[in-house]
């Protein structure tokens, strides 16, 4: 078992997610490549400055445009939206996800009114789609179910959601962020319209549970696998599956200095670890534009490397996404984003876009105690803010939320 340094640990996680040492994907094709590299892209409807998924792709794809995601997913049929935690996954994975969908159908739903929608309702919804074509929740009438759901309270809406979760319908596109559904056979490319054998699906998700995290703690790997296949995975089953992966030469165990946790890595990614430990950047990670030392990256709220406590574990950086907290309970701000400089998180800012005046307001800015305060960082911050403003269409910037006087003055000059 090899042991890697903490620096290698965080660089590997960032690099595997396509965030370091800079953007190595470009344009529309690069958008698809980035999502494949990420193993999946979490989607969120909130649009304070841009949606989380758009910010995630801005951080990985040079010349990313807001329309690229929907083009890659819905026009090119490269990805599908799925899950209680809404993600976009490569279309090639759909046959494996049919196992998850099968277990969803067996377990049913957890509404007070029903666990499985009435057969007559299912038949009605499917017939409407078949005869009328792609439809959204708003295209159906119907009675409200006596159980609140943010997905829609109409019976037809819940039936649509159920059919989507069991794989009978798919999201064919979106109006804004509203889902437009259609029958699976009219959305899914025919070469992927089959059910992978259960053993193959479990093997696939066993590997994906490692690839998704880059370096996965053994306990986290088991939890991820259980989510992917939508059933409990016992300790005994987990142990057998893991030992098989190791015996087959698919995965290995890794130690991180200073950590008691055991980690897993795919053997196909081992060369990257070796390069990083030797102080070299893997050739496959070569940036197509400025590096993160030359231009900071604003990280999306739902980034895998920072979400769910990983910011603290990996970077010793406290991060909370506080959009659902009352104002008086927020520590930082409504839509605060971490700032990546080099291979570390050094600051956070709370942005807001005024779409009437096309002004990006920085409502708050917080540097870490050990963050650099030199001209190189200030220049990288200016470059990062400029690219972010271009992404969201901001023509002006209001920097009054930056309380560091010298830094604010420098940025004003650079961003004229």
Sequence positions of predicted segments:
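Long, charged, low-complexity, helical-prone intrinsically disordered regions
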Residues: 1-416
């Amino acid at each position: 078992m090899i042991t890697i340094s903490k620096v290698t640990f965080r660089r590997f996680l960032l690099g595997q997610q396509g965030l370091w040492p800079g953007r190595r994907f470009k344009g529309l094709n690069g958008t698809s490549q980035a999502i494949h590299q990420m193993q999946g892209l979490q989607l969120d409807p909130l649009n304070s400055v841009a949606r989380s998924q758009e910010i995630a792709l801005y951080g990985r794809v040079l010349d990313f445009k807001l329309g690229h995601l929907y083009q890659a997913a819905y026009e090119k049929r490269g990805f599908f939206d799925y899950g209680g935690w809404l993600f976009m996954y490569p279309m090639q994975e759909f046959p494996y996800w049919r196992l998850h969908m099968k277990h969803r159908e067996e377990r049913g739903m957890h509404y007070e009114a029903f666990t499985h929608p009435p057969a007559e309702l299912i038949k009605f919804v499917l017939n409407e789609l078949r005869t009328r074509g792609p439809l959204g929740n708003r295209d159906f009438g119907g009675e409200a179910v006596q159980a609140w759901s943010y997905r829609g309270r109409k019976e037809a809406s819940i039936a649509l959601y159920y059919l989507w979760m069991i794989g009978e319908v798919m999201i064919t596109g979106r109006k804004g962020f509203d889902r437009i559904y259609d029958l699976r056979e009219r959305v899914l490319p025919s070469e992927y319209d089959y059910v992978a054998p259960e053993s193959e699906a479990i093997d696939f998700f066993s590997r994906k549970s490692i690839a998704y995290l880059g370096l996965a703690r053994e306990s986290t790997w088991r939890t991820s696998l259980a989510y992917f296949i939508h059933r409990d995975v016992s300790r005994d089953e987990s142990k057998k599956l893991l030992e098989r992966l190791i015996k087959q030469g698919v995965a290995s165990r890794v130690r991180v200095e200073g950590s008691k946790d055991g980690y897993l890595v795919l053997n196909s990614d081992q060369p990257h670890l070796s390069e990083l430990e030797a102080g070299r950047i893997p050739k496959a990670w070569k940036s197509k534009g400025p590096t993160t030392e030359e231009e900071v990256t604003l990280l999306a709220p739902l980034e895998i490397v920072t979400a769910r406590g990983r910011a603290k574990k990996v970077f010793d950086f406290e991060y909370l996404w506080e959009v659902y907290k009352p104002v008086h309970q927020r520590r930082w701000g409504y839509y605060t984003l971490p700032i990546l400089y080099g291979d570390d998180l050094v600051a956070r800012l709370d942005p807001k876009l005024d779409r009437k005046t096309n002004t990006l307001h920085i409502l708050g800015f917080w540097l870490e105690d050990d963050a650099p305060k030199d001209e190189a960082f200030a220049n990288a911050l200016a470059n990062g803010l400029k690219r972010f403003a271009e992404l969201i269409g901001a023509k002006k910037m209001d920097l009054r939320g930056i309380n560091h006087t010298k830094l604010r003055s420098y940025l004003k000059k650079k961003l004229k």
